[in-house]
Regions:
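Glycine/small-residue-rich hydrophobic helix-like segments
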Residues: 185-235
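Non-catalytic, topology-defining segments of multipass membrane proteins
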Residues: 1-184, 218, 227-254
Length: 254
């Protein structure tokens, strides 16, 4: 058993969850969490595999404005499972192509580096507060984003290869495929399977999904009130934020 490889996989998983849940979602999109400016920028750079900050925030806010209605960019009710899961990133409804994209892992980072900052930008106007920050505007530009994400991917490959050779690279591919699919499952599975709390949309609380997505699986609660840090005391997000708060790096709503 390669203990160092296991630790590296766990750290990668944690950073993947922090990127989507704490940074892009709760901090940038909904302003539920306030981080020290320098620390926020550092964490956004680490979150770049999830997409550019401007595009991610704009698309997510559009989703909240038109949840499961005309105008929702990734509703499984409107477009089917695979388009909602990951096809909307690449504007493709072909099940096989969507499936290949979903399992691409580290190769998805290289593809996204070119594709994401150049496509699906129609909701960027909803993230003007993000693009008004010069640093976020700069790293969201196509060439800058591509270079940073490709460097990010190369560094990950070198780290995992140095730990366990080809096996390390295979495990890197697997953990990234898992992280991407867990994040994408919030847009697909959490709008199909689980418990509804109202009839205004199809968002559902999926407790099994919540266990692996830093509480994001409590999706119906989030859509009912996006200004509350959902499920905060029942997942790792709470403990991470408490640690950050102790060091004066974060403030968050209780």
């Amino acid at each position: 058993m390669n203990v160092i490889l296991i630790i590296a996989l766990f750290i990668t998983y944690i950073f993947g969850g922090i990127s989507a849940s704490i940074i892009y979602h709760q901090t940038l999109s909904h302003k539920v969490i306030v981080l020290k400016p320098w620390f926020e920028k550092l964490m956004v750079v680490l979150a770049l595999p999830a997409g550019t900050p401007v595009q991610w925030v704009g698309t997510h806010r559009q989703h909240h404005l038109f949840t499961d209605k005309d105008g929702d960019p990734h509703s499984p009710k409107l477009f089917g499972f695979w388009f909602a899961h990951c096809g909307w990133y690449i504007s493709n409804k072909n099940t096989f192509i969507c499936f290949l994209y979903s399992i691409a892992g580290i190769f998805r980072m290289f593809f996204d580096g070119y594709w994401r900052p150049r496509n699906r930008l129609e909701f960027n106007h909803l993230a003007k507060d993000i693009s008004d920050v010069e640093f976020y505007r700069i790293i969201s530009k196509p060439m800058n984003y591509m270079l940073i994400l490709w460097l990010y991917a190369i560094v990950l490959c070198l780290i995992f290869y140095s730990i366990a050779g080809l096996i390390g690279f295979i495990f890197l591919w697997a953990i990234l495929a898992l992280i991407y699919n867990l994040g994408d499952a919030i847009n697909s599975i959490a709008h199909i399977y689980g418990k509804k709390i109202n009839n205004t949309n199809h968002a559902k609380n999926n407790y099994l999904l919540s266990l692996f997505t830093f509480g994001e699986g409590k999706h119906a609660n989030h859509h009912a009130n996006s200004q509350i840090l959902s499920n905060a005391k029942l997942n790792m997000v709470y403990f991470i934020l408490k640690t950050w708060k102790i060091f004066g790096l974060a403030k968050f709503q209780k």
